Amino acid sequence: MAQSEVDSVDCVTSDRDGDIGNQSDDSSNSSLFKTQCVPSPTRKQRIPTVKCVPSLASVETDSSSDSSLEPRPLTLKAIFERFKKKKRKKRKKRKYKPKLRRQGRPSGTRNIRRSQIDAKQIKDKGAVFPFLESESGRKTLPWKKILTYEQAVARGFFHHIEKLKYEHHLKECLSQMHAGEDLEKEDFDSRRHKYMDDDGPLSPIEEPSTEDEATDPQSECDIKLVEDSCFIISTEFPRKRNLEQGKIKKESAFSKKSKAKDATQRGNRRSWKGGEHACLHSEVS
């Protein structure tokens, strides 16, 4: 009996091993065609849910919140009120709060050595004017007048260059006119205000040559007798008052004419209207 039981157990185990082997072979064969194994669906545990009935107060709050979220139509009054509130907030922020601090430079921050060097450099390089000592008590220029001083120096420099240029140009012109002796007799400043043809006559009209001049061309005199034809005839120009009076008279005459025209036009209109009224009255009657 015992042997038969053992044999039966061995047969069962061998059958099981054969089934497992067959299953492994099937899986190996199926792996050739399927790369992924489909996992078996697992059941999820259901969580018990509790249904709560909302109260009336919560419903009212939800409805109010929904209504607040809805866009309301903007009015001018609401826009102005919002703008005023923003302005008030800004004004409140900008309020001045007095601070308990000392005015001026805080102690210990100034470099004394650096300030002394700057003062020395200014004294050495700055312009010195002795006549300023009576006004400001020091010879150096104050900060406010340094710019005006520099502008005056530049202006004088450019004026000097202009003068040198004029002298050079004058020398060239006189050398071309063979009048270099005039430069030795007169200075450049006196010659600057003269014209090149000062020796000739001032009048644009040519003077008639007389017999005395023809006979004695070298005779020179300070006064000469000249005919009336050499002078320009004097003309009297109208004054400003006369011109203004003439303008006023013209304006008054023009205004009178315009008034007379207006009066005649008004009379014609009235007569025409009167005739029309008479015609209408006769037709009605």
UniProtKB/Swiss-Prot annotation:
Q: Give the span(s) annotated as Disordered.
A: 1-49, 85-112, 193-219, 242-285
What role is this protein assigned? Component of the transcription factor SL1/TIF-IB complex, which is involved in the assembly of the PIC (preinitiation complex) during RNA polymerase I-dependent transcription. The rate of PIC formation probably is primarily dependent on the rate of association of SL1/TIF-IB with the rDNA promoter. SL1/TIF-IB is involved in stabilization of nucleolar transcription factor 1/UBTF on rDNA. Formation of SL1/TIF-IB excludes the association of TBP with TFIID subunits.
What residues bear Phosphoserine in this entry? 24, 134, 229
> Subcellular location, in the record's words?
Nucleus
A cellular component term, taken from the record's GO annotations: RNA polymerase transcription factor SL1 complex
Q: Which UniProt keywords apply?
A: DNA-binding, Nucleus, Phosphoprotein, Transcription, Transcription regulation
Question: Locations of Basic and acidic residues compositional bias?
Answer: 242-264, 273-285
Q: What is this protein called?
A: TATA box-binding protein-associated factor RNA polymerase I subunit D
Q: Which organism is it from?
A: Rattus norvegicus (Rat)
Start-end of Polar residues biased regions: 21-39
Instruction: State the taxonomy lineage.
Output: Eukaryota, Metazoa, Chordata, Craniata, Vertebrata
- Which regions are flagged for Basic residues bias? 85-104
Q: Is DNA-binding there in the keyword field?
A: yes
Q: How does it assemble?
A: Component of the transcription factor SL1/TIF-IB complex, composed of TBP and at least TAF1A, TAF1B, TAF1C and TAF1D. Interacts with UBTF.
- Pfam families listed in its UniProt record: TAF1D
Q: Which GO terms describe its biological process?
A: regulation of DNA-templated transcription
**What's the chief localization of this chain?**
nucleus
One GO MF annotation is:
identical protein binding
